[in-house]
């Protein structure tokens, strides 16, 4: 889950300003933008060493170098982000910034931790927002030499403290030609700091004329800051004063922080290589107090409401708190995961001083804890989630808290809505996420980008219900890329000012195309290209073969406009860089603008420009995106239809960025740059108030209606906005509001999306997915209560439509049916089968179906102690028990209500480091005939292992030192086999079921090739597909369901075996029953041969089931001579196995063949019979291979050649230690 875009967080010093002539590489951040360049002017190196605070979370790059044309890519490589590799990149809590800023996804999922990938923190899409995460500073490095240098760009001698100014006269009203228009400006040089290669800038802009700039010299060889200067302006940047004497001439400063709730309060950190101290100012940097610290600060997190409350994270992973703005500090907790601590959220957490934090444990896991900053003792801490969680997975964002738990290699995500109990996030059953990022948590809804098991460079977009639990698909295959910091960029953009409008770049047949939605992802369409180009020539571009495509990455540099921008105070106005054609391109790009929320577009430039909003969207200012020095900018008052050219400096300036937002109220913008390669930093103050003739009046506005391809209802309402009339050069002012009137519409189909478990067929029909049973109520539905039975539709969150189809599509209340307990499970909190003697072992009891409130629970710990509960409520957080002796304990959970009961067993042991075990059993066995059962263990080189085998209801295991065992089942029915493998101090188990019958017949099945593309190759999917095939066979042939068993094999191509079983009410007339069975086989065989058996996997995917064998398979039973053909086939299997064995042994003596065998072993099935296997029949066992983990990854099962019987996966319940990486 990853941040898509967020406002400048609190507690972060600013990100870097890069001193370079290549504006493509400039990266600035408000509230202390840090500038870094190599002292030689060459390509920089990472600016933060291991001892420094880690870098600020990466802001989304405007483009990745490898995606640009070669000449641009090489230019972009001239500067790099100079940050130390951090463990996690997250949005922060609070403000701490100058002016407003919007940035895109920050943060890579951490790699290298033990327990699965963590959840990158979420942030808000579109519009300015407050984020609540801690984040350290960032550094960036100066690029290579600039392309050219002005002739008069040489440096002169200037006083160290005063700098220099250059005055530029304002033009007369209604000046002459556009090229003669000038804007009043002043230029100031930070004289004496030309050697400094980093800088941080802060200007709040809110009723303040103060600008602070911290410059410093970072020595890459020493890994520390060796010099620093602090500059302060009180006249909006006209002049600056050097403050080194006020902070201490020998004090070397490293970072600047601004309080987000009171921007007059400033914090400066000294470089820890020199000393550990903090300087505090309460008068906007005029005076400072210095305090020594006993720890080294890595990052700060200010409280979003209380201006004096601060959290400090140290380099040794300790969390400190201060309630007096850093004058005194108190240790809260140790072993805190970096960037995983959060302040309370007003209106949700009861205490304002509550802190949410993730604490690492000594065994490689983490716990989610909360405590108050002044009362964080062990007795006062709370654990809202009882189980261990993955490291770097805690996210607290708005109304939601997210965590991740990885068990048996598969991650599960949990969410708490408004601090309620955690619930597991429900994605469509077979989404199987490899990676997940939170895009947005706006408007009581979660947007999540999920990379599924069959995706590599794309993500699917899912949107949730209000509680953030049930997710449905909004768009497939959204393009992703890696940022300069390695962060994931999801190319999705929310248009500010109008809810529900998103732009997304989707990968379609290896082409990337831009789509737009007006109803939060329910419907998407391509962008219509402009009718004419910039020169007025017709553009011949017909949908869907040709359309407009946009670059949706936001700027990594808040001092550049980014490649797409919109503004809350200018609804409907979108400016973006893109191209016209069949797909998105990084060549032949221009700048396009839409005045009506993306319905229509016009081209305004034929090359790349930075375009900013002036006067809260009332005007636009543009500056060419070029590595060359510039003197002019362009201003438009009619939404880009026409532009006026203004000069802002008499000497051409290599522009590194411009600060526009902070000076919005005063109509002042600051342009940062330099006149030559070795010159000082130049800060050009541009006063553009003269371009406005007056304040706007009522007569200066006009209205416009928001439409979606002519449809006036967008997100269930009609909206009318007002905007300034084109050409009116009047100032809007801060209080300008764009919205005029809004009224609800009658609900139509496009106001509803498919509910969880349903998929879209056609334009508006939602039907259940093949894996979903809509008739099954939630497991927390108690008898006597009611639940909402979905109609398959749910109204889009924040949609305001009324009446119409609303009643038809609204979920209907139904009484909860009584249900017997089913799917009972007992697990340990960490998912492992190990407990230390004398320590707490915590058990969790789970139940798939049943009445939680009316079911009695009993848990027998297996050591003579048992506990009972009247319902599930007291045990939701787990049942703790201390074992006083070591050994094997059979822990039994029993659930019962008046409709039935269920039992679950867990075998607990103190065991060794075995990581995986795979139990291989046949699906079907013959009564009174031996069955060969084996276990495959990984890693294979573990020495002596002990195997514990449980058959059926036995309470004592059979213990062997061999990985295989033979067993005879004496009665018909379904039996359970459990194996536990112990070695050293670890124990793992696998459980499977086997059907025992007097006789059966089977047929091999194959499928149409389109099923392979949708095959994730996991047991649950194979089981569901088997059920779908069974239902299809029953429907076509009317054969009783209990006489059919389908076993879908692992691997590709997808294949299966059909077992035809005798009826349950088997009589003594066996001959007749065998005849009936053969008749059923012939009926099924004919139906399959006629292609009558098929099913729809998903909309548009129809799968046909075929018979692999051309002839009917013989009957398999307990009679030795019943079928000579069966015996011949079995003998064939034996001889083939012997031949393969000999060839394999011979191949082992030839090195290159041996290598081939090792690589290919995951495709070679073991050939063993499920019934009466010969004792002396040679076979190839999986343990012969050197890399059995490949087999376990695919969970390879074995089958008998010729279709006699099959070794395959049955439903498996595994208790395997959680051994994944985060």
Swiss-Prot record:
<feature type="signal peptide">
    <location>
        <begin position="1"/>
        <end position="33"/>
    </location>
</feature>
<keyword id="KW-0472">Membrane</keyword>
<dbReference type="Pfam" id="PF00801">
    <property type="entry name" value="PKD"/>
</dbReference>
<feature type="region of interest" description="Interaction with DLG4">
    <location>
        <begin position="1219"/>
        <end position="1222"/>
    </location>
</feature>
<dbReference type="GO" id="GO:1900452">
    <property type="term" value="P:regulation of long-term synaptic depression"/>
</dbReference>
<dbReference type="InterPro" id="IPR035986">
    <property type="entry name" value="PKD_dom_sf"/>
</dbReference>
<dbReference type="GO" id="GO:0099170">
    <property type="term" value="P:postsynaptic modulation of chemical synaptic transmission"/>
</dbReference>
<feature type="repeat" description="BNR 6">
    <location>
        <begin position="634"/>
        <end position="645"/>
    </location>
</feature>
<keyword id="KW-1133">Transmembrane helix</keyword>
<dbReference type="InterPro" id="IPR031778">
    <property type="entry name" value="Sortilin_N"/>
</dbReference>
<feature type="glycosylation site" description="N-linked (GlcNAc...) asparagine">
    <location>
        <position position="207"/>
    </location>
</feature>
<dbReference type="GO" id="GO:0098839">
    <property type="term" value="C:postsynaptic density membrane"/>
</dbReference>
<comment type="subunit">
    <text>Homodimer. Interacts with NGF. Interacts with DLG4/PSD95 and PICK1.</text>
</comment>
<keyword id="KW-0812">Transmembrane</keyword>
<feature type="repeat" description="BNR 1">
    <location>
        <begin position="231"/>
        <end position="242"/>
    </location>
</feature>
<feature type="repeat" description="BNR 2">
    <location>
        <begin position="279"/>
        <end position="290"/>
    </location>
</feature>
<keyword id="KW-0677">Repeat</keyword>
<comment type="function">
    <text>Plays an important role in modulating synaptic transmission and plasticity in the hippocampus, probably by affecting the trafficking and localization ofAMPA-type glutamate receptors in the postsynaptic density.</text>
</comment>
<feature type="glycosylation site" description="N-linked (GlcNAc...) asparagine">
    <location>
        <position position="953"/>
    </location>
</feature>
<feature type="repeat" description="BNR 5">
    <location>
        <begin position="592"/>
        <end position="603"/>
    </location>
</feature>
<dbReference type="GO" id="GO:0016020">
    <property type="term" value="C:membrane"/>
</dbReference>
<feature type="repeat" description="BNR 3">
    <location>
        <begin position="320"/>
        <end position="331"/>
    </location>
</feature>
<protein>
    <recommendedName>
        <fullName>VPS10 domain-containing receptor SorCS3</fullName>
    </recommendedName>
</protein>
<feature type="region of interest" description="Disordered">
    <location>
        <begin position="87"/>
        <end position="180"/>
    </location>
</feature>
<feature type="propeptide" description="Removed in mature form">
    <location>
        <begin position="34"/>
        <end position="133"/>
    </location>
</feature>
<dbReference type="InterPro" id="IPR050310">
    <property type="entry name" value="VPS10-sortilin"/>
</dbReference>
<dbReference type="Pfam" id="PF15901">
    <property type="entry name" value="Sortilin_C"/>
</dbReference>
<feature type="repeat" description="BNR 4">
    <location>
        <begin position="515"/>
        <end position="526"/>
    </location>
</feature>
<keyword id="KW-0325">Glycoprotein</keyword>
<dbReference type="Pfam" id="PF15902">
    <property type="entry name" value="Sortilin-Vps10"/>
</dbReference>
<feature type="glycosylation site" description="N-linked (GlcNAc...) asparagine">
    <location>
        <position position="789"/>
    </location>
</feature>
<keyword id="KW-0770">Synapse</keyword>
<dbReference type="GO" id="GO:0007612">
    <property type="term" value="P:learning"/>
</dbReference>
<dbReference type="GO" id="GO:0007613">
    <property type="term" value="P:memory"/>
</dbReference>
<feature type="transmembrane region" description="Helical">
    <location>
        <begin position="1126"/>
        <end position="1146"/>
    </location>
</feature>
<dbReference type="InterPro" id="IPR000601">
    <property type="entry name" value="PKD_dom"/>
</dbReference>
<feature type="glycosylation site" description="N-linked (GlcNAc...) asparagine">
    <location>
        <position position="456"/>
    </location>
</feature>
<feature type="topological domain" description="Cytoplasmic">
    <location>
        <begin position="1147"/>
        <end position="1222"/>
    </location>
</feature>
<feature type="region of interest" description="Disordered">
    <location>
        <begin position="40"/>
        <end position="70"/>
    </location>
</feature>
<dbReference type="GO" id="GO:0007218">
    <property type="term" value="P:neuropeptide signaling pathway"/>
</dbReference>
<feature type="glycosylation site" description="N-linked (GlcNAc...) asparagine">
    <location>
        <position position="840"/>
    </location>
</feature>
<dbReference type="InterPro" id="IPR015943">
    <property type="entry name" value="WD40/YVTN_repeat-like_dom_sf"/>
</dbReference>
């Amino acid at each position: 889950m990853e941040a898509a875009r967020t406002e400048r967080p609190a507690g972060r010093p600013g990100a870097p300003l890069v001193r370079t002539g290549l504006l493509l590489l400039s990266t600035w951040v408000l509230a202390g933008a840090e500038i870094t360049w190599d002292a030689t002017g060459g390509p920089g190196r990472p600016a933060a060493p291991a001892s420094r605070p880690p870098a600020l979370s990466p802001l989304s790059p405007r483009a990745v170098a490898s995606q640009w044309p070669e000449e641009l890519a090489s230019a972009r490589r001239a500067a790099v982000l100079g940050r130390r590799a951090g463990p996690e990149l997250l949005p922060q809590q609070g403000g701490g910034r100058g002016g407003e800023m919007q940035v895109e996804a920050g943060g890579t999922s951490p790699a290298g931790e033990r327990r699965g990938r963590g959840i990158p923190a979420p942030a808000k899409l579109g519009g300015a927002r407050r984020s609540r995460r801690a984040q350290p500073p960032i550094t960036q490095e100066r690029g290579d030499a600039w392309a050219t240098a002005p002739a008069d760009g040489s440096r002169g001698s200037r006083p160290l403290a005063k700098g220099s100014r250059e005055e530029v006269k304002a033009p007369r009203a209604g000046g002459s030609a556009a090229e003669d228009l000038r804007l009043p400006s002043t230029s100031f040089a930070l004289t004496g700091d030309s050697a400094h290669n980093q800088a941080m800038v802060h200007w709040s802009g809110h009723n303040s004329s103060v600008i602070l700039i911290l410059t410093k010299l970072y020595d890459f060889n020493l890994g520390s800051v060796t010099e620093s200067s602090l500059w302060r302006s009180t006249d909006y940047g006209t002049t600056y004063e050097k403050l080194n004497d006020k902070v201490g001439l020998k004090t070397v400063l490293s970072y600047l922080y601004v309080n987000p709730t009171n921007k007059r309060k400033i914090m400066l950190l000294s470089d820890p290589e020199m000393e550990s101290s903090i300087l505090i100012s309460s008068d906007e940097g005029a005076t400072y107090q210095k305090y020594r610290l006993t720890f080294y600060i890595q990052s700060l997190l200010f409280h979003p409401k209380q201006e004096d409350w601060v959290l400090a994270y140290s380099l040794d992973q300790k969390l400190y708190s201060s309630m007096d703005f850093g004058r005194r500090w108190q240790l809260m907790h140790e072993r805190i995961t970096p960037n995983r601590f959060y302040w309370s959220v007003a209106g949700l957490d009861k205490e304002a001083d509550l802190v949410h934090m993730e604490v690492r444990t000594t065994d490689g896991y983490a716990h989610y804890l909360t405590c108050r900053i002044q009362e964080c003792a062990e007795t006062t801490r709370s654990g809202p989630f009882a189980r261990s969680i993955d490291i770097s997975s805690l996210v607290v964002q708005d109304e939601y808290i997210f965590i991740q738990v990885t068990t048996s290699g598969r991650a599960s995500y949990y969410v708490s809505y408004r601090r309620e109990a955690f619930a597991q996030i429900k994605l469509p059953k077979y989404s199987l996420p490899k990676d997940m990022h939170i895009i947005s948590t706006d408007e009581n809804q979660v947007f999540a980008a999920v990379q599924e098991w069959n995706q590599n460079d794309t993500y699917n977009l899912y949107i949730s219900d209000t509680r953030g639990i049930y997710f449905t698909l909004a768009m497939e295959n959204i393009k992703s890329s890696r940022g300069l910091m390695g962060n994931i960029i999801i190319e999705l953009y929310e248009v500010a000012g109008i809810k529900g409008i998103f732009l997304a770049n989707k990968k379609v047949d290896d082409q990337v195309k831009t789509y737009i939605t007006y109803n939060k992802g329910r419907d998407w369409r391509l962008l219509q290209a402009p009718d004419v180009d910039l020169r007025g020539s017709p553009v011949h571009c017909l949908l869907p073969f040709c359309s407009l495509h946009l670059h949706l990455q936001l700027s990594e540099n808040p001092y550049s406009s980014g490649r797409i921008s919109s503004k809350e105070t200018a609804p409907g106005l979108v400016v973006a860089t893109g191209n016209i054609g069949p797909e998105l391109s990084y060549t032949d790009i221009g700048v396009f603008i839409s005045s009506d929320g993306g319905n229509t577009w016009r081209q305004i430039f034929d090359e790349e420009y930075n375009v900013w909003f002036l006067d809260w969207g009332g005007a636009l200012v543009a500056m060419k995106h070029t590595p060359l020095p510039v003197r002019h900018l362009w201003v438009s008052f009619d939404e880009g239809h026409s532009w006026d050219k203004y000069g802002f400096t008499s000497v051409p300036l290599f522009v590194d960025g411009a600060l526009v937002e902070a000076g919005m109220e005063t109509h002042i913008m600051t342009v940062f740059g330099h006149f030559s390669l070795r010159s000082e930093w130049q800060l050009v103050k541009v006063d553009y108030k003269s371009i406005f003739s007056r304040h706007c009046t009522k007569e200066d506005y006009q209205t416009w209606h928001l439409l979606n391809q002519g449809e006036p209802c967008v997100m269930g309402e009609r909206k009318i906005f007002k905007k300034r009339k084109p050409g009116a050069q009047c100032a809007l002012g801060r209080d300008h509001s764009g919205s005029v009137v809004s009224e609800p519409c009658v609900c139509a189909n496009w106001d509803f999306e498919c509910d969880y478990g349903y998929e879209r067929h056609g334009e508006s029909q939602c039907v259940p997915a093949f894996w979903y049973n809509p008739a099954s109520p939630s497991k927390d539905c108690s008898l006597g209560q009611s639940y909402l039975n979905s109609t398959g539709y749910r109204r889009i969150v924040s949609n305001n439509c009324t009446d119409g189809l609303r009643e038809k599509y609204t979920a209907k209340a139904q009484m909860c049916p009584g249900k017997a307990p089913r799917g009972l499970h007992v697990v340990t909190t960490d998912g492992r089968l190990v407990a230390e003697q004398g320590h707490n072992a915590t058990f969790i009891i789970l139940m798939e179906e049943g009445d939680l409130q009316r079911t009695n629970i009993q848990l027998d710990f297996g050591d003579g102690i048992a506990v009972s509960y009247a319902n599930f409520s007291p045990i939701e957080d787990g049942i703790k028990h201390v074992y006083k002796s070591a050994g094997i304990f059979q822990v039994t959970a029993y659930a019962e209500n008046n409709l039935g009961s269920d039992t679950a067993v867990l075998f607990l042991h103190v065991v060794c480091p075995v990581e995986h075990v795979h139990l291989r059993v046949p699906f079907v066995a013959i009564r009174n005939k031996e069955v060969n059962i084996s276990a495959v263990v990984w890693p294979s080189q573990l020495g002596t292992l002990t195997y514990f085998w449980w058959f059926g209801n036995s309470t004592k295991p059979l213990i062997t030192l061999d990985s295989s065992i033979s067993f005879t089942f004496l009665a018909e029915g379904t039996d359970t086999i459990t194996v536990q493998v112990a070695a050293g101090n670890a124990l793992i188990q696998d459980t499977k079921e086997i059907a025992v019958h007097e006789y059966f017949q089977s047929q091999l099945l194959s499928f149409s090739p389109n099923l392979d593309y949708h095959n994730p190759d996991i047991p649950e999917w194979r089981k569901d597909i088997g059920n779908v095939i069974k239902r299809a066979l029953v429907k076509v042939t009317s054969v009783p369901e209990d006489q059919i068993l389908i076993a879908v094999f692992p691997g590709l191509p997808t294949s299966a075996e059909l077992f035809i079983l005798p009826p349950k009410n088997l009589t003594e007339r066996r001959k007749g029953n065998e005849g009936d069975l053969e008749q059923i086989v012939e009926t099924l065989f004919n139906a399959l041969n006629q292609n009558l058996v098929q099913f729809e996997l998903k909309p548009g995917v129809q799968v046909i089931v075929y018979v692999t064998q051309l002839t009917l398979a013989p009957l398999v039973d307990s009679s030795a001579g019943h079928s000579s053909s069966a015996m011949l086939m079995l003998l064939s299997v034996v001889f083939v196995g012997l031949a393969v064995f000999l060839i394999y042994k011979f191949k082992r003596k030839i090195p290159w063949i041996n290598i081939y065998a090792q690589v290919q072993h995951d495709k070679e099935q073991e050939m063993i019979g499920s019934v009466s296997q010969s004792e002396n029949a040679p076979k190839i066992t999986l343990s012969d291979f050197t890399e059995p983990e490949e087999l376990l990854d695919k969970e390879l099962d074995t089958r008998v050649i010729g279709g006699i019987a099959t070794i395959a996966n049955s439903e498996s319940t595994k208790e395997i230690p959680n051994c994944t990486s985060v």
